[in-house]
Amino acid sequence: MESNKDEAERCISIALKAIQSNQPERALRFLEKAQRLYPTPRVSALIESLNQKPQSTGDHPQPTDTTHTTTKKAGGTETPSANGEAGGGESAKGYTSEQVAAVKRVKQCKDYYEILGVSRSASDEDLKKAYRKLALKFHPDKNHAPGATEAFKAIGTAYAVLSNPEKRKQYDQFGDDKSQAARHGHSHGDFHRGFEADISPEDLFNMFFGGGFPSSNVHVYSNGRMRYTYQQRQDRRDNQGDGGLGVFVQLMPILILILVSALSQLMVSSPPYSLSPRPSVGHIHKRVTDHLNVAYYVADTFSEEYTGSSLKTVERNVEDDYIANLRNNCWKEKQQKEGLLYRARYFGDTDMYHRAQKMGTPSCNRLSEVQASLHG
């Protein structure tokens, strides 16, 4: 995979710097990771070369990220993050100068496209690829640099907004408008910029990668949204005056629309079938379609009301709904499996990789059978 190759190249680059800094153990770790991601003769030769050299290390192995540990000793104090986080969960653990630089880059981004590193014409697949790469890189359990948590939230919010067609359209129109930012109390340096995601960054991460990081104890989504919601409520209170009649006149079109919608719903009859038993509407009698043998459930009077062409129409609708459900479930199964495989490769977890490979996709298998039957 191309993403594996890019990640392997990054690991090789880090390993070469470690060799120059006389850190053979660190170099070996990254070279082995690169070889797992994208095997090449060059990496194999470097690993063999390092294994043949005597390693001048003490009895105790050094932690993985030693770069910033040395810097902190030389400076005598820890450097707080840009958002005032110092000495907490992030800065108490080791991190590298590359991680600090990466967090700084995200903080300097002016819009969501720049955060994800994609163009404004990026497709859904481009957004997914960028999010996968960055989410793993900035997750607080992986990246302990100051500000990494905020960067992780920014990446999640960026993807959640841009992957939603309606939100993306609004963002393209108003996202860079200074007055829009000021109206929501955000500057261009703020990660949220007036747009809120419908899902927390941690939930989004779990959706992509089939579960959170092991032993995760970081609550990523702070009360930022609550503050924003409170501000909206406060704005509404400020805008409420003694013009009650004016408000009623403004709401009248919406009330009429709701009323018309409710009446139309009452006039439209419910489907005469369900794909699973629904005693509440009387759909308890099981039937099977003639073409694909799809099970569906109907009421007592179904056989009397639907015969001939009307029955064929109903069964065609049943099969269409069934195929749509299969497609949806198949997509979810593939996403879960792909996310788990990606995590396993990234962390070099052999057990996780084998578990992901064994994960079944029953909906996809059934969908293939149905499609073969339709075209057969």
From Swiss-Prot:
SUPFAM superfamilies: Chaperone J-domain. Keywords: Acetylation, Chaperone, Endoplasmic reticulum, Membrane, Methylation, Nucleus, Transmembrane, Transmembrane helix. The modification Pros-methylhistidine is found at H186. GO terms for cellular component: endoplasmic reticulum; endoplasmic reticulum membrane; nuclear membrane. Residues 57-84 have a biased composition (Low complexity). The modification N-acetylmethionine is found at M1. The keyword Transmembrane helix applies. Methylated at His-186 by METTL9. The keyword Membrane applies. The chain crosses the membrane at residues 243-263. Gene3D superfamilies: DnaJ domain. Its main location: endoplasmic reticulum. It comes from the Eukaryota. Belongs to the DnaJ family. DNAJB12/DNAJB14 subfamily. Homodimer and homotetramer. Interacts (via J domain) with HSPA8/Hsc70. Forms a multiprotein complex, at least composed of DNAJB12, DNAJB14, HSPA8/Hsc70 and SGTA; interaction with DNAJB14 and HSPA8/Hsc70 is direct. Acts as a co-chaperone with HSPA8/Hsc70; required to promote protein folding and trafficking, prevent aggregation of client proteins, and promote unfolded proteins to endoplasmic reticulum-associated degradation (ERAD) pathway. Acts by determining HSPA8/Hsc70's ATPase and polypeptide-binding activities. Can also act independently of HSPA8/Hsc70: together with DNAJB14, acts as a chaperone that promotes maturation of potassium channels KCND2 and KCNH2 by stabilizing nascent channel subunits and assembling them into tetramers. This is DnaJ homolog subfamily B member 12. The lineage of its organism: Eukaryota, Metazoa, Chordata, Craniata, Vertebrata.
